[in-house]
Amino acid sequence: MPMTLGYWNIRGLAHSIRLLLEYTDSSYEEKKYTMGDAPDYDRSQWLNEKFKLGLDFPNLPYLIDGTHKITQSNAILRYIARKHNLCGESEKEQIREDILENQFMDSRMQLAKLCYDPDFEKLKPEYLQALPEMLKLYSQFLGKQPWFLGDKITFVDFIAYDVLERNQVFEPSCLDAFPNLKDFISRFEGLEKISAYMKSSRFLPRPVFTKMAVWGNK
């Protein structure tokens, strides 16, 4: 019985989950919900099902795997990762993992907050000014390692790829000063399962955000 991943028909919070499902060769199907156009942005496709799925905290994305019904994107990632030994093992690795998971979510939210703000054009320069310092910290944290926890890929690398690459989409030159982050992106995209997925019709790199966003809505 394949797992079911439910989310809007966008990249959004599901990108790293889809990538991890593909990398682990998991059997899954997607339930993609479509949001209506402006000005109403009708969400009835999702709202009609929201409280009928048996979710403890009904939200998108969700993952249903038999009797396991999970919401919260990082909880979903951790669930898949545990099945495939893609979590940190030592105390040091788990500390790095926990820090990174939350740090990348902060960075993800900063970009999302900007892109949904009606004053996007006014606020964009401030974001771009702060971006190099943020990326510098990630570059230092990665160092000369191939993956963020060391020699072994883990689920936080999937979050890292999503956040770093969407900033690269937002500002194409942002990683130029950080060759190890650029190499990380290339290394990730070069993984056999990831490369195959990116060439498939299932791959959904855009739109980054919902139709309500000022940037990344197409």
Curated annotation (Swiss-Prot):
GO molecular function, one term: transmembrane transporter binding
Keywords: Cytoplasm, Lipid metabolism, Phosphoprotein, Transferase
InterPro entries found in the cross-reference section: Glutathione-S-Trfase_C-like, Glutathione-S-Trfase_C_sf, Glutathione_S-Trfase, Glutathione_S-Trfase_N, GST_C, GST_mu, GST_superfamily, Thioredoxin-like_sf
CDD domains the record matches: GST_C_Mu, GST_N_Mu
One BP term from GO: nitrobenzene metabolic process
Subcellular locations according to the entry: Cytoplasm
Entry keyword Cytoplasm: yes
Site (Important for substrate specificity): 210
Domain GST C-terminal: 90-208
Keyword Isomerase set for record: no
EC number: 2.5.1.18
Organs and tissues of expression: Muscle.
Cited PROSITE patterns: GST_CTER (PS50405), GST_NTER (PS50404)
Domain of life: Eukaryota
A single Gene Ontology CC term: intercellular bridge
Residues where Phosphoserine is found: 27, 44
Family: Belongs to the GST superfamily. Mu family.
Quaternary structure and partners: Homodimer.
Reported function: Conjugation of reduced glutathione to a wide number of exogenous and endogenous hydrophobic electrophiles. Participates in the formation of novel hepoxilin regioisomers.
Protein name: Glutathione S-transferase Mu 2
Organism encoding this protein: Homo sapiens (Human)
Lineage of the organism: Eukaryota, Metazoa, Chordata, Craniata, Vertebrata
